[in-house]
Amino acid sequence: MSHSLHHTDAADTAKLLQELDRDSKSRSLTGGYKTAMTVLFVLYSLTMIVMALVVSGATQYTRLPVFVGMTLFVGYLKYPASKRDALRDNFFPWYDIVLAFASLGVFFYYAIEQKRIIQMANRIGTTQIVLGIIGILLLVELCRRSTGIPLIVVVGLFTVYGAWWLTNNNPKTALRNLIYNLFYNLNCGIFSSPITVCASFIVLFIILGSFLEKTGIGTFFVDLANSIAGASVGGPAKVAVISSALEGMYSGSSVANTVGSGSITIPTMKKVGYKPEFAAAVEAAASTGGQIMPPIMGAAAFLMAEITGIPYASIVVAAILPAVLYFTGIFLMVHFEGKRLGLKGLPKDSIPHFFRLLAKSGYLLIPVVILVICMNYYTAGMSACFAILFSLIISLIGRDKHDLVRTIGLPLIPLAVLVVLWQVIKIDTGTAVFVSMVVAVLCSFLTRSAILSPRLVAEGLQGGAGSSIGVAVACAMAGIISGVVSMTALGTTLVAVIVPLAQKSIFLALFCTMLACIVLGMGVPTTANYVIMATITAPILIKMGIPLLAAHMFVFYFGIVADITPPVALAAYAGSAIAHSNPLKTGITATKLAIGAFIIPYIFALNPSLLFIDVESVWALIGIMVTSIIGMAGIAMGMTGHVYAHVPWYMRIMLLAGGIFLIDPSPVSDLIGLLLIGIPFAFQLLQNRKLKATAAE
């Protein structure tokens, strides 16, 4: 890494995650307890990989209860009941042990007795009702520990509504039907589409992200961004934007991304002259955008594929242009703020050479390339497994130039095994990939010069398992919400009531949906937020004429920006803790920087060509991109108050208004927007030339 980039202490980073990221709020373990927990996490991740590759033919009645049961088991061992318990080293109270094994018992009972339960259908007996209630309560308690109270409140309200609806229809069977639908029915409830997607795809991508992090790709991305923009105006802030966008490809957590890259970029931004609030806000805004950055988007994107029936690969393609616009907006804000403050870039001699860096470390991108290629031919889960395999393979590349046999030869062994098993012997793809993974791990015992080692493999699997628990719990809880909506036809009722009221104003419907997503996102994880909004508000937007993908992308975007929207802006708070800035001011500044996230969804909702939907021509798409970028530039200039020099207040209003007019895709609004932006820009340009001419004389 370039020596110009200073970072905070690793212990400080861990402490920040412990405070702000619930996935890091685990027990304090040392010695044998820590080793035992690591073994459990490794077994958990291995089970997920084996279920995806080797025993993929198992029925959902087996896979899903086993997955949820194991998740709750390790979850109760990871997350203590209270902050007081978390402060005590190696403390496992008896009730946590009981809850952990009770989780295994209840959910494994379902897997073992699946045939009997299927035959019973909604005529389940007292035993099944009691076990179902216990299973739901176990999930709720772990949700309290791992995700927080707000999601429980939301789920509780929906459950009460479901119970009331069933009681009105038939009081005698209300409890039985409620438990059956929420716990045993695979079409709604805990085991519905959210947890199915989590078990099939999301966990595998989380494990992939953990392995990519271990390869050192994060450091490579920071250096790559530094080589691209480090020497330009406000270079360190631009480095933060680019590196966070790249890191977002494998990090699904805004907070973790902010803390991880922010520990490097924020101190550097402060050093060159950026205010602490601005430095923290840049990192928070860019890191939050990581969840919309293809090819590995946030967990909610996989749920979108399942709910809409649109292939994940198509969603990734549709997300490209909005992501480009989002980060372009932040980049322009940073650029004009840097010009306003007169900030220069980093010294050129401290910046890595772009092509030398690619030649040295470009191979770290191979797993990402493999992932993109595989998505065109295989399921998302299988594609993730291929990428995990190649993460292991590239990690076998040695750093000892004098031992070429091991440096180059070892990575070729698992690759050769894959080719022979898959293409020569013709065994099934999943088994071939799994055996090749095992061979790669065995090869790690034969070298000390490579990144890959048995310890790194264990850490990668452990990290993937630890990060999966909170997401899986949120998916299971979200399933309860979607189950109630499906069971009671609440979604259809809301569409019938709201659409006529909002028919006259599509902007009003979009604005109300935006507010609902942001408010809900302040207390509910992105995954659950998306499921709730996709179940309730997306159908309303679709009924009003917005295309399916555009409606779901709209709620997806606004569920994410809650991480930087005050008063509950966890990513902004994480950045402020590193920068030692005011958290509220940081959140407000981050919201200003990420203004694109509040504008872009309106653009693709009103003109879905931005998502490659019904594109009239390539030129029409280029026109949308150009006007959108000009609009983002106008807003950036208006908000920073600087183009070539200070911009008067009335011109700032013109620039902001011009950017807003360019949201509407009609030719008239585009012309007005271009004029409103063009006049102040031309005035600034002419004034700047006069000043230069005067200075030259």
Question: Whereabouts are the PLM-identified features?
Answer:
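Core transmembrane alpha-helical segments of multi-pass membrane transporters/permeases
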Residues: E141, R145-S146, P150, V154-N168, ...
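Long, contiguous bundles of hydrophobic transmembrane helices that form the permeation core
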Residues: S2-M37, V42, V317-G466, L570-I660, ...
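Hydrophobic transmembrane alpha-helices that form the pore/transport pathway of multi-pass ion
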Residues: V222-G290, I296-L303, G309, T526-F558, ...
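Transmembrane alpha-helix interface/packing and boundary motifs in multi-pass membrane proteins
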Residues: G209-E213, S244-S253, A285-Q291, S482, ...
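Conserved, well-structured core domains of diverse proteins
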Residues: M1-N122, I129-I133
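Membrane-interfacial loop-to-helix junctions in multi-pass transporters
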Residues: T126-V130, C188-F201, S227-V241, V272-F278, ...
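Membrane-water interface regions at transmembrane-helix termini and the short interhelical loops
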Residues: M51-S56, L77-D89, R116-I117, G135-I149, ...
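Hydrophobic or amphipathic alpha-helical targeting/insertion segments
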Residues: A100-G105, E113-R116, I124, I129-Y184
